[in-house]
Amino acid sequence: MSGHNNSELFVLCSSSQLFLQPLWDHLKTWETLILSPFFPVFFSITTYLGFCLPFVVLDVLCPWVPALRRYKIHPDFSPSVWQLLPCLGLTLYQHVVFVFPMTLLHWAASPVLLPPEAPELLQLVRHIVLCLLLFDTEFFIWHVLHHKVPWLYRTFHKMHHQNSSSFALATQYMSVGELLSLGVFDMVNIMLLRCHPLTVLIFHVINIWLSVEDHSGYDFPWSAHRLVPFGWYGGVTHHDLHHSQFNCNFAPYFTHWDKILGTLRSAHAK
């Protein structure tokens, strides 16, 4: 009976691996680009700006399309070009001047080889969930410390709070110290779990999307916090309240740490 169960489990794992293999085989045709030292920065910037662009378009249209305002957390606010351009400029500058040298050092110290086989689907999902939970925990601790210690707040985190009403391009409007800290959290978690390169790519896409959505200022019916049950995920309304009140909702994504420490505040309780 045990052998029969083990055989079924082996077939299930093999099938889930085959499910991802065509995608991985296709990505491997771009192996030279993926293994290039330029790829991490190129991938990060293009993914980030690609996710920001729809919200920028919505912000431009919002004054002319009143129906869009029903989805805005702050219906009367739309970022001006003088708010958007500094955010875009800072993101590009920091990625070129600071992030690229760091990724170059990591590329030289830890060369990556693309394995021939894709990860099992269950393993990929498990690692992505663990990466998100670890990042959420690390940033929660970092975030609370930077709000409780005035010097840390002034030196590293104050810049991110210059825009009290969030918008997508303000997601990475932060000091270089904060940006690099978030990058280190990502890198450590991926190395700790020994994630497959495909898992790493998908995790980064999900993480960038969730962070942009958190700052977008739009609460849609399909927003992440409406899709995750039981109030486990805070989402855009949760994080927007942090930007307006400062002393609550420190976790970027999930709600458990704020619940445990008594810093969770509902957007409905404003």
From Swiss-Prot:
GO terms for molecular function: C-4 methylsterol oxidase activity; cholesterol 25-hydroxylase activity; iron ion binding; steroid hydroxylase activity. Coiled coil: none annotated. Pfam families: FA_hydroxylase. The chain crosses the membrane at residues 38-58, 81-103, 127-147, 167-187, 190-210. N-glycosylated. GO terms for cellular component: endoplasmic reticulum membrane. Its EC number is 1.14.99.38. A motif (Histidine box-2) lies at residues 157-161. The keyword Iron applies. One of its GO terms (biological process) is response to type I interferon. InterPro entries: Fatty_acid_hydroxylase, Sterol_Desaturase_Related. Residues 128-263 form the Fatty acid hydroxylase domain. It is a multi-pass membrane protein. Keywords: Endoplasmic reticulum, Glycoprotein, Iron, Lipid biosynthesis, Lipid metabolism, Membrane, Metal-binding, Monooxygenase, Oxidoreductase, Steroid biosynthesis, Steroid metabolism, Sterol biosynthesis, Sterol metabolism, Transmembrane, Transmembrane helix. It is an enzyme of class 1 (oxidoreductase). Its cofactor is Fe cation. Its main location: endoplasmic reticulum. A motif (Histidine box-3) lies at residues 238-244. Glycans are attached at residues 5, 163. Catalyzes the formation of 25-hydroxycholesterol from cholesterol, leading to repress cholesterol biosynthetic enzymes. Plays a key role in cell positioning and movement in lymphoid tissues: 25-hydroxycholesterol is an intermediate in biosynthesis of 7-alpha,25-dihydroxycholesterol (7-alpha,25-OHC), an oxysterol that acts as a ligand for the G protein-coupled receptor GPR183/EBI2, a chemotactic receptor for a number of lymphoid cells. Belongs to the sterol desaturase family. PANTHER family: STEROL DESATURASE. This is Cholesterol 25-hydroxylase. It comes from Sus scrofa. The gene is CH25H.
